[in-house]
Amino acid sequence: MTVFASTVTSEQAVAAFAPQVKGRTFVITGAGQPSIGSSIAIELAKASPAHLLIASRTAENVHPVITAIREQDPSVKATFIQLDLSNHDSVRRAAQEILAATKSKIDVLINSAGNMALRKYTLDKQGIEIQMSVNHVGHFLLTNLLTPALLTSAKSPYGARVINLTSVGYQISPVRFDDVSFSDGKTYDMWTGYGQAKTAQILFAYGLTDRLKDRGVVAFACHPGSNLDTKLGSHLVMDDYSDVLPTTKRNTGQEFSFTVGDEPRFKTYEQIGATPLIAALDPDLAGRGPAYFQNGEVVEPVARHAVYDKGEVDRCWRLSEELVGQKFEY
């Protein structure tokens, strides 16, 4: 794969892989402004994609992004799809709208929507803890419902890809298979909830690749880098982050690591979309995986519970099927 500097920007990543953008269809979740998803969408618009679909809760949040895309290139088709990942009825409706709008052909799905370290214990409509719901379970359902469209594009020269945005926060906790919703809140911890959800997204990427790689679809889990410019952690204060290290140690017995190699502790807003874009576009990655990306490259997760293990991967898949009430077999 192409090697980039640790300070590579989203713009540079798109420029390097412009042929892998031109004429292709991308679906991005959670791309309200400002967010990692919106930065990715706006940069992709510079390289002449055929269609950018942004799935988010409210049109108001996405309108500035659609406007920015059209300013980049008025010929790029940009579509808003209403999606509430915490409501499975909404996910199913959104999937049908996306399939119709794309004529059942999607080249790249980027699952970038999410929430982080919510202080108040909350359940979604289905009774699932809200961080697990939005970060993982809703995306699991959406991705599987869109898989027929990904398989159609899998026949193209570049294949099809799914990018799950995870976080170094995965280190905080493994998936709590026997108690994903914290005993109705009695044992809830906001960072543990975030950690298990981000671990689940890694295991999901592994599981999807296991099932579909031979048919031309691969999924990668990506930590985009830490950044304070998006709305993701806007409800937190710096003291909240002091709980990350002891919570990780308590849950896993391991130390928490913020970076790998020469990765900056914080990436700029211009850099924050680069790693997922590299994973989505680099043609040398076709047929590769399962894999986890950080700092623009494939790395081994530092936490034992996120290293590929088929038993754990399949266990997460089965749990996710139970939570959405539907089996997906390929």
Enumerate the language-model features and the residues they cover.
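Short, amphipathic alpha-helical "lid/cap" segments that border enzyme active or binding sites
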Residues: 92-95, 269-280, 310-317
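Rossmann-fold NAD(P)H-dependent dehydrogenase/reductase core
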Residues: 3-239, 330
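Residues at helix-coil transition
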Residues: 46, 280-284, 325
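C-terminal tail/cap regions
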Residues: 6, 256, 285-330
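Residues within well-formed alpha-helices
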Residues: 61, 130, 275-278, 289, ...
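SDR active-site lid
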Residues: 210-288
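Active-site rim elements
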Residues: 188-195, 259-266, 303-308
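Non-transmembrane alpha-helical segments in soluble domains
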Residues: 147, 205-209, 276-277, 317, ...
